[in-house]
Amino acid sequence: DPVIYPVEGFDMQSMGKDTLFHKSYENTDISFSPNIIWVSQFNYKLKKELSLDIISKYVDEQFIDNTSSENRKLDDYLVNNLQLTYNLKLKNVNEARLTLMVNNVLNNQYSNRAWIYRFVSQGWDPSGSDPYINADSDGYNMVGHFPQAGRNYLLGLTLGF
């Protein structure tokens, strides 16, 4: 159960007395620390100077804060990328490489970061008026996610002298 500490004399724009809630948690996961991160890279040499890489990354579900609450958790995700590399032969250049990357090939919608603001409201239920707010047994959570890019392309040129 939360421990309630009244904050005497707190006054901010005539808010009067406020209450500070404190709750201790034990044996919780560390925020933004998934249990599993798996990365693989397969390289196929299509020709002597041309290669294709398939790069996959899986990240297990992870919590936004250190409470291990299901209301404050990011879903797991899998992202696949392709990289096509062509080695060029140029005069006066030791190494020349042209690279085309297609990131998030399957155009997955995922979020790998978020923020949380916890608050208590005793006279008003804000969860119906704001899509970013959900309620739990201890109060309300305002959660914002940072969605990652869908399919995107990157073209690069590497020159070594």
Show where each model-derived region lies.
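C-terminal beta-signal and adjacent terminal beta-strands/loops
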Residues: D60-F63, N87-F161
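Residues that define the transmembrane beta-barrel architecture of outer-membrane proteins
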Residues: P34-I36, D76-N80, N94, A149-Y153
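Gram-negative outer-membrane beta-barrel transporters
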Residues: D1-Q62, N66
